Amino acid sequence: MEGGMAMWVYHSPIGDIFIKRLSDGRYGMIHNGTVWESCDSPQAEADNVYMHVTGCYDWDRLDGKIYDVPSDLSEWEVC
């Protein structure tokens, strides 16, 4: 991951999930070193994590089973 770029982290039950600005200007959802998807804004990416629609099976399968998922990017830790 390149330094100096905006990045957020959510310490989830499956491990850390990051939202990071990618080299193409989009924002990616990263877990275990894999970019699972990307969106035009970090808020849109945070919404996808909240809704469990990321393409990451380990995360998406927990839909309805976790009740403290950040509902807004402002609830993510800036790193």
Predicted regions and their residues:
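Short aromatic-glycine-(Arg/Gly/Cys) micro-motifs in beta-strand/loop hairpins
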Residues: 11-35
